[in-house]
Structures are given as structure tokens and as C-alpha cells.
Amino acid sequence: MKCAGQIEARAVEESSINLDPIQAAGRLTPEAMKAVIAWGDGYSVCDNCHKPFRLDYVTKPPIADFHEEAAKWLGMDKIQLVPGARRAFQEVTGALVGKGEPVIMTGMGHYTAYLSVEVVNGVVREIRPTADHHITADAAAESIENAVREFGYAPKLVFVDAVDFMYGNMHEVEKIAKVAHQYDIPVLYNGVYTVGVLPVDGKKLGVDFVVGSGHKSMAAPAPSGILATTDEYAEIVLRTTKIQGDITGRKFGIKQVGILGCSLMGDPAVGLIASFPRVKERVNHFDEELKNHKIVTDALLSIEGTKVASEYPRKHTLTRMDTAGSFDVIARTHKKRGFFLSSALNKRGITGIMPGVTKQWKFNTYGLTKTQAEYLADSFIEIAEENSMVVG
């Protein structure tokens, strides 16, 4: 079915169990779906934008209220809506990092974090991951010390991934923040896989910035995200314009410089707000998500030669599997090669695992019901047995 011209109507979430790691927690709530239809027109959220002419002051829809509520929810002082987490990274580096200045990165960070340093001509110095793919406070301290010796001063910022996108492992955020603050370095908590999925309290963690992704983990349309900060850094990162035209004398009120005046508009903003009540509630039930995830990982581990490449037992629903000794062995002689696994899953209404990959692959069960998790587990077992693999 086409919804317009050559644009096919998307029915992945309705027709399949979707295991794509970046899509699992971004599925819209029914409330967001309705809000998207109602507020889809261009500058719709500007219907009631009056003095001081800034989106976070708009009360209809309740954008202003959302800013206050979300800041409290994250244990921070101020928030700003942004078009995706990457724009939050860019806004922070744009305010804090200068040409040639060092920024500490985890070594397992998303490419957009690196690019946010590159765009301001900064320099990245990485924290070396452990052999089991963790970022530790000791390793962070070593990287900071190395940077101090190299540059003669402390790095301008430390990025910390709460849960990394490669393995879905959890890292020592609170301990790393304490180390960074010993050098007076601000800490950015990258919560794209936690904000909206797990409880997050920035002040308890001791971080200066919390970044969340609306379309990845807060059941919101893309592009959407949140930048939360403390009062101390709000004055710097969320600063307002001071520029003035030399001929006209024009000024621009309290427009924010880092976001070029106005933040998130239209469907991304209203969809994020519409999903928020459910998102606030669901973070309290992550233990149930882990139970469902365990059903699937237990089934996979029962297939001889299969391992969990991520930390184990699992603490997150994004997991990297190592099937080099199981599914990849079959792929070497199967007529479909590495595509046999995704093909077999697709026949069972399961999608989201990268086609052609059988050595190591990621999946995310967030949002699945117990029944769906059991079906998924049974499907992996069936595929293994169909290919004469040892299960038990």
C-alpha cells in the first residue's frame, strides 16, 4: 500500500517483531501517533508563540510545562529540546571546546560524539576500553592524565556513555564523573540508550549534562532529543544572544545562540511531549524488560557454540551475540550463505537483525511482551534445529 506517490506505507511494527537496536524504544505511543497527525503542519507549535518569542515559553501545546517537568525528572536544573542527541553534543562542544583543545571520549562512543568535537576543531583523546568492553574510572583517570601532560592543561569535556551502542554494556558513570571533577572537567552523560528506558538522575550521578534521544529511547518522532544541564552550565551552553546589527541596531531578544534561536518544532516536539507520561512510567519497569530479554538470550545460549559477547548477566536489552561457532558455521555451506539467518527470521515475522551477518550481531528486545519473547526464543531454536545444530 502506498500512502502517497511512490512512498510505501510503513508497516514494520504492525507486521513484525522488530529487533533493530536503534528502533526498539523509539516506537510511538498511541498518544504520540494522534499528536503527530494533529500537529504535523510546519510551524504548528508557533500558533501561540508570543513574547518573549521562544519555543520553551509556549504553553499551548504545553512545551513550557514539559521543560520544567522533564528537568525535574532527570534530576537537572534546565533542559532544552534538540533535533536529536547529536545536536546536543554539538551544542555543548560549541560552547566549551575551542580549536585544538582536547576532549575525552570513551573509545566506544557514537560517531556523532566524535564529529561534535571535530566540527569545533577540537581534539579527541580516548579512554581505552577493557578487554571485556567496559570503560572504567581508572582508565578515564589515565586518559585525563595523559592529556594533561600532552596539552599542559585539563581536557575541556569528558563524554561518558551510560550504555554503549556496540555491546549494550553499562559503564562506571558515577566513578568517572568523580575523577573528571577532580580536574574540574565537566561531564556529559550520553543517555541515548537509558533516558526514557531506565531511571536517570543526573545530579546523583554527578554529571553536568544529560543527553537523551527522543527517537531512540523516548517513543518520539525523529529528530528529537533532550539536553539537560545544571544552572552553572546553563548560563554558558544555553546562553542567549547579545549580537546587534551595526547599521540597523537590531537585537534578537532571548533567542538561544547554540540552537540558533528556536529549539524543537512541530511533530518531534509534540510527539515527545505526548509520549512523556507513558515514558515516565515505563522506566520503573525495566526489570520486566530484562526478564523478557533473558528468555531470548537463554534460548540462544542453548544453541551449541553461541555466546553473549556483551557483559553477562545482561543489564540492558541491547545485546551483542557471538554466533561464530553456531550460525556462522552453517552460513559457510548454506546456499544462502550468511543471509540464511535473517531469511529464516523474516519468514517467521521477525526483522531488525542485519541481513547477511552471522558472526556477531546485535538485537534489542525492549518493548516486547512475554509472549513475543517466547515466540522469538522458540524461533531461534527452530532455526537451529532445522539446520541440524545441537540444542540443549
Swiss-Prot record:
Converts O-phospho-L-seryl-tRNA(Cys) (Sep-tRNA(Cys)) to L-cysteinyl-tRNA(Cys) (Cys-tRNA(Cys)). Pyridoxal 5'-phosphate binds at residues 85-86, 190, 213-215. NCBIfam families: PRK09331.1. It catalyses: O-phospho-L-seryl-tRNA(Cys) + hydrogen sulfide + H(+) = L-cysteinyl-tRNA(Cys) + phosphate. It comes from Methanocorpusculum labreanum (strain ATCC 43576 / DSM 4855 / Z). Transmembrane segments: none annotated. Keywords: Protein biosynthesis, Pyridoxal phosphate, Transferase. One of its GO terms (molecular function) is Sep-tRNA:Cys-tRNA synthase activity. The modification N6-(pyridoxal phosphate)lysine is found at residue 216. InterPro entries: PyrdxlP-dep_Trfase, PyrdxlP-dep_Trfase_major, PyrdxlP-dep_Trfase_small, Sep_Cys-tRNA_synth_arc, SepSecS/SepCysS. It is an enzyme of class 2 (transferase). Its cofactor is pyridoxal 5'-phosphate. Belongs to the SepCysS family. Its EC number is 2.5.1.73. Homodimer. Interacts with SepRS. This is O-phospho-L-seryl-tRNA:Cys-tRNA synthase 2. GO terms for biological process: translation. It holds the Pfam family SepSecS.
